[in-house]
Amino acid sequence: MAGPLTVPWMPPHDPGTPALSVVDMHTGGEPLRIVLAGCPEVVGPTLLAKRRYMRQHLDHVRRRLMFEPRGHRDMYGAVLVPSELPDAHLGVLFLNNEGYSSMCGHAVLALGRFALDFGLVPAPPSDAQEALVNIHCPCGLVAAFVECEGCRSRGPVRFHSVPAFVLATDFLVDVPGRGKVVVDIAYGGAFYAFVSAEKLGLDVCSAKMGDLVAAASAVTEAVKAQFKISHPDSEDLAFLYGTILTDGKDTYNEEPTTNICVFADEQVDRSPTGSGVTARIALQYHKGLLELNQTRAFKSSATGSVFTGKAVREAKCGDFKAVIVEVSGQAHYTGTASFIVEDDDPLRDGFLLK
């Protein structure tokens, strides 16, 4: 029997296109592909300017890493960039199957571990139980707290969100083929529409995923057409990211409440959705269903994975009353890879099946 195969060289590829080296992680089942090397410089004086530059000039990097054959329609990614904020340890641009997210909680939880393990933050004191990682996301600065032993991460990570607020409650939206549906719209670094799956004739815990995706996508498109999203800080943040279908259990309870998030181009989050948990906590606090520092558990109907969240203090976002939300979850490493492009590959920039 032949021994293990060793490959000391890269496969044939376009010498003018550097290999894209990545570390893969997941948080509650939701993937995160972190670019280590091979991405051209992302130019811009601010993080939001860098986001615009990448969309306009480097979108082939996103497509190559997120799309098939190197990824899949539910792949998620992160490109690390310098931040203009003095307190930030790193800046990040989030990649999805449609474009560029403003916030991603599952990615922040993973990046907290990654930043500590890969030496992107100062080494914590030898007796420290947690390391602070300040991550500049497109929505703002997010503080992640990473359980550690020396310079290595261990256990769960938690983060404190940007100010989260409610944009609308009980908004009546006409969903084609499904009638009039009442939704809430809240912001947790990204805007989501929230609706109980029961109002759409579905059980979020047992319905077929295709049915949940179709229903959530219909709500998203209807809200986009019938409600004007605005954000007090930047028009770059003023868009509906997706719809979160819930089990309707918004009143405080020690038992987990279940939801599923469908975002971008019908992309399904395998985790409970960190920015969605943030927005849902803000919504429950706004409605008087939750007090400060009351912890709720949120379960993904896709994988059963659980995040916890709580409102830790009140804040403001423009004229909106807001809260800072703490979200906790566990991220894991899954591997490393180097992706290449051959110059005669007609599918070099990837494709998606729908």
From Swiss-Prot:
Coiled coil: none
InterPro entries from the UniProt entry: Pro_racemase_fam
Single annotated GO MF: hydro-lyase activity
SUPFAM superfamilies membership: Diaminopimelate epimerase-like
Catalytic machinery residues: 104
Disulfide partners: none
EC number: 4.2.1.77
Keyword terms of this UniProt record: Lyase
Binding, substrate: 105-106, 269, 274-275
Reaction it catalyzes: trans-3-hydroxy-L-proline = 1-pyrroline-2-carboxylate + H2O
Family membership: Belongs to the proline racemase family.
Complexes and interactors: Homodimer.
Name by which UniProt lists this protein: Trans-L-3-hydroxyproline dehydratase
Species: Bos taurus (Bovine)
Organism phylogeny: Eukaryota, Metazoa, Chordata, Craniata, Vertebrata
